[in-house]
């Protein structure tokens, strides 16, 4: 028995007649397709043109999503007009009204996200100098500075921290305006200029060990304005924002490096900047240097020799290495912060 005979025996008795009807129907349809209907109204073609224009907008365009949603909304609107005025098709109108509502809500959301975000006048400097080059958005910056920090002032001569008295656990600050000077036992160490952390060495070195005090005195050398975070609340916030956490690690590390090199040449804090600044290992910071000074009684000669410095980079490094060897802090590493 052939395959064809098996197939015929398994079919119902009236299948052949139904199949003939279907064949005839298909032939009729093929004949009818020769009579094309007239072209739809211009509104129909405008709708499809809007859809096509929205889809071909390049994704590299900054506002391509806004243009896409706008063209989809316009296309749906034309389809609704066409369905109501020229086709009287309720289903086409309902579907396109639904699509129009969805796309319009998305369009409004995108416009809201693109709105210009205002940054406080006092904070624009540190945003443009420190955070914007690292691709921190204004919205994220406002979250960082708007919840658990405040802007404070210090008059000339007032102290931000006093050695052996002020706790390092309470705050972290960035100087917005003015100049501060850092001294140890009456000896000037370096200055802190605007757009720099005030207590970054203490913040880094006491992340694991709390309850310590400043080993230096920080005094306002001018009328100063600074941004002050609550350290505990800032730590909790950064734990929920991994991107900002890495930004803070980088900025604090860079600030510590700048402070370290300004110990040999105080003019670095005001007039000069190092193009390529080698850094310390993560365990080595200015705070450890300060603690090493505090733990040594006979350190006046070493401090004076260290602060004297020389004009060349190689001699600066030699002086620093001698200083660290003398006070038992450990070898100096010249790895670069990433």
UniProtKB/Swiss-Prot annotation:
Enumerate the UniProt keywords alphabetically: Cell adhesion, Cell junction, Cell membrane, Developmental protein, Glycoprotein, Membrane, Tight junction, Transmembrane, Transmembrane helix
InterPro entries for this protein? cNMP-bd_dom_sf, POPDC1-3, POPDC1-3_dom, RmlC-like_jellyroll
Which residue intervals make up region (Disordered)? 296-317
Q: Does the keyword Cell membrane apply?
A: yes
TM helices/strands, residue ranges = 41-61, 66-86, 92-112
Which residues face the membrane's Cytoplasmic side? 62-65, 113-338
What membrane topology does the UniProt entry give?
A: Multi-pass membrane protein
Which tissues is it found in, per the record?
Expressed in the heart.
Q: Which GO terms describe its molecular function?
A: cAMP binding; structural molecule activity
Signal peptide location: none
Task: Name a biological process GO annotation.
Answer: striated muscle cell differentiation
Query: What glycosylation sites does the entry record?
Result: 21, 29
Which cellular compartments is it found in?
Answer: Lateral cell membrane; Cell junction, Tight junction; Membrane
- So which stretches are on the Extracellular side? 1-40, 87-91
Family matches, as Pfam families: POPDC1-3
Q: Which GO terms describe its cellular component?
A: bicellular tight junction; lateral plasma membrane; membrane; plasma membrane; sarcolemma
Biased composition regions of type Polar residues, renumbered to the chain: 307-317
Functional note: Cell adhesion molecule involved in the establishment and/or maintenance of cell integrity. Plays a role in vamp3-mediated vesicular transport and recycling of different receptor molecules. May be involved in the formation and regulation of the tight junction (TJ) paracellular permeability barrier in epithelial cells. May induce primordial adhesive contact and aggregation of epithelial cells in a Ca(2+)-independent manner. May be involved in epithelial movement during corneal sheet formation and regeneration.
Q: Report the family membership.
A: Belongs to the popeye family.
> What's this protein's name?
Popeye domain-containing protein 1-A
What is the organism of origin for this protein? Xenopus laevis (African clawed frog)
Quote the gene name from the UniProt entry. Answer: popdc1-a
